[in-house]
Amino acid sequence: MAVQNTHRSYIGIAKETTKGTAVATPTAYIPVIANTVKPQDIYTPLFDEGLRGSLVKNYNYIQGRIHSTFDFGGAVFADTILYPLAGVLGEDVVSGSAPYVHTLALKNSATAAADAQPAAYTILDFYGANVRTWTGHQFHDFSLKWNADGLLEYDAKSTGWQSATASTPTPSFTTVLPTAVWTGTVSVAGSTISNSTTGNIDMKRPVTPIYGISNVQTPYSVFVGALEVTGKATFLMENDTQLTNYLTNTQPALVFNWTQGTGATQTQIQATMTKGAYTLAVIERSKDFVEVIVDFNAQGNLTDAGVAGYSPIKWVVKNAVTTSVA
């Protein structure tokens, strides 16, 4: 046996047709940063604590129900970022051609007995010593983060069924370049500004592995709840504009947009929050220059909505991916 090198690792992903049924061959391979990749099978511990006349707490350990989690992240690539975005939101409508426009919003339904849950995904993990697939994974956390002089980065979290060993695939990675933050623009209340320096957008949904009694350890369903979108943005404080937006509850439209290239190979990642409620604004003097750090909470609205209902955020992603991944 040989000690395995971390840098041999890679992960792949594919949308499942049937939740919990593994897709043998990934449709995309996602470049990730090594220390962000954290797959884990989690058993509920069951302990026999029956008294037996001794100063012992536990006598037997039984593995209870099982689910798994898979965290990963890294630099944002305008094609593979679709998977966690669509996984959290549930709706990906494709239009145009070369580059294709993916409009991602919160999946809703007004139809009785409809399934409003997002799609589930199979995640493949090659970790040198072996290969495993993690099935039925629902994305529930996504964080986009940026600093003016760095790369656009993200973290994603998913929950699903237990892992299983798999065959080694032949990976094929994106040729798209990661996104440099300096290529972006920031718009507040319809006006483009140039004094925003750092920020993040966090999309979170509660997730619950639901267990039935059917002689299996795996969940009956991995269920995600309502979406909340929050974030922070730092501005150089040249005037009171952003502070006033907070004090007067203006709730300005916030648009963060990154576009690279032209023509058929152009890529774009744009987040729009039409009702960006400022929940806090702090004047910051830890540097040689004054900043104001704003916390925001995106409110549900019809402008950012998809096919049905409300949505607090809408993403537009342009790339060469021809089909929906939701």
Language model features by range: what are they?
Residues M1-A326:
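Signature of extracytoplasmic/envelope-associated structural regions
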